[in-house]
Amino acid sequence: MTDKKYIVALDQGTTSSRAVVMDHDANIVSVSQREFEQIYPKPGWVEHDPMEIWASQSSTLVEALAKADINSDQIAAIGITNQRETVVVWERETGKPIYNAIVWQCRRTAEICEQLKRDGMEEYIRKATGLVVDPYFSGTKVKWILDHVEGSRERAKRGELLFGTVDTWLIWKMTQGRVHVTDYTNASRTMLFNIHDLDWDDKMLDALDIPRAMLPEVRKSSEVYGQTNIGGKGGTRIPIAGIAGDQQAALFGQLCVKEGMAKNTYGTGCFMLMNTGEKAVTSTHGLLTTIACGPRGEVNYALEGAVFMAGASIQWLRDEMKLISDAFDSEYFATKVKDTNGVYVVPAFTGLGAPYWDPYARGAIFGLTRGVNSNHIIRATLESIAFQTRDVLEAMQADSGIRLHALRVDGGAVANNFLMQFQSDILGTRVERPEVREVTALGAAYLAGLAVGFWQNLDELQEKAVIEREFRPGIETTERNYRYSGWKKAVKRALAWEEHDEA
């Protein structure tokens, strides 16, 4: 145990940068948050200004320490968690970006992805990187910058330009250009990293014409990478000692560090990750294979599945359908009826993600009869989030052969007790909701704290992890399967809607 009293987690997200100060009992002492500009140069293109990312993140660090009235010499370490896949390319000499950050949501590299498919790279990419060919991942974004900024590829070959995901960019700035690193979890989202050899993949670098000289060193998620003196009063150099991409940080924050443990984050969409231990499981059900953190930040593997519409479907009830005036009201109205009266809502507004991967599916409401009212539709919309989660979990169990015993949950929608109970009912599994909801920041703090001895081991952290509420299945297996079969029938009818229309 150190005499330093606090850990700071920097949580660099897609729309805001946050700093969270935690004490030795993993209690939150102070939080600072700043939003920054979203740049949309063309339809489907999304950018951030890397200097604004840096300015917003560094100012939240200073603010969070000032709010808590803490000197930098009281901080044991800083941990970083970040929006994944987003790309920055900058000059080694000046630290100046040569282009805006291209954000994970940006679709501009769709044609590069199509070319990779035409070149027969799809199967290799799945096996080597664990990913599917999609503009979502970093590699094609780096290629796009090198293709479109004059002279940049030659400069990169000469070692004048550097590439990094957001974690790498922040650490470069925090250490005044002394440290150029990333961690295994972020590297595994680039489509440039071989998740089996744990090294940058030469075949992928050649395919995208990306010089190796511009890539960061890849390190464990929990170790000291460098020191920073940013943070206001005290002037002491603070170790930067933890890095993980946001979903992997949440998995670690939920202490899902053993094979078969899983968490689901309920945000705009859902991200479910299951730790598969030391073996990388190749999915045959449309899931991603990715790197997660083991008990000491070492490499573990995970399966990841994404649901596109979770919280977004509740926003649709509020903003477009005007059935509720606040997202929190959905629980109240859903519990005014005893069931959905046979209604199923399939919220495939932008197609369906894992395990269907059908961009042509469209949203639909099935089972309407004269007795159906708005409460039934609200309830069915909430239930659709739980059904989609079961779809992903079934794919995970089929790929891994692991039976889930409990699902840990986080994100905005977990405050909805009706949804959490129905989730448990439809999975036939315990659902555990933690007391501390800031699990992404918690994961980054844990990784940093373990690296510097602020916490000794995971047993110490387990003692601090309080499950605020546990939901247990309250329906019989026959009822569960009957309801789920109705969902599957509804999804089947919503698939390929657009294609059917065009035929």
UniProtKB/Swiss-Prot annotation:
It catalyses: glycerol + ATP = sn-glycerol 3-phosphate + ADP + H(+). The keyword Transferase applies. One of its GO terms (cellular component) is cytosol. Belongs to the FGGY kinase family. Homotetramer and homodimer (in equilibrium). Heterodimer with EIIA-Glc. Binds 1 zinc ion per glycerol kinase EIIA-Glc dimer. The zinc ion is important for dimerization. One of its GO terms (biological process) is glycerol metabolic process. Pathway: Polyol metabolism; glycerol degradation via glycerol kinase pathway; sn-glycerol 3-phosphate from glycerol: step 1/1. Keywords: Allosteric enzyme, ATP-binding, Glycerol metabolism, Kinase, Metal-binding, Nucleotide-binding, Transferase, Zinc. Glycerol binds at residues 84-85, 136, 246-247. It comes from Klebsiella pneumoniae subsp. pneumoniae (strain ATCC 700721 / MGH 78578). InterPro entries: ATPase_NBD, Carb_kinase_FGGY, Carb_kinase_FGGY_CS, FGGY_C, FGGY_N, Glycerol_kin. PANTHER family: GLYCEROL KINASE (PTHR10196:SF69), SUGAR KINASE (PTHR10196). Coiled coil: none annotated. Key enzyme in the regulation of glycerol uptake and metabolism. Catalyzes the phosphorylation of glycerol to yield sn-glycerol 3-phosphate. Activity of this regulatory enzyme is affected by several metabolites. Allosterically and non-competitively inhibited by fructose 1,6-bisphosphate (FBP) and unphosphorylated phosphocarrier protein EIIA-Glc (III-Glc), an integral component of the bacterial phosphotransferase (PTS) system. This is Glycerol kinase. GO terms for molecular function: ATP binding; glycerol kinase activity; metal ion binding. Sn-glycerol 3-phosphate binds at residues 14, 84-85, 136, 246. It comes from the Bacteria. It holds the Pfam family FGGY_C. ATP binds at residues 14-16, 268, 311, 315, 412. Its EC number is 2.7.1.30. ADP binds at residues 14, 18, 268, 311, 412, 416. It is an enzyme of class 2 (transferase).
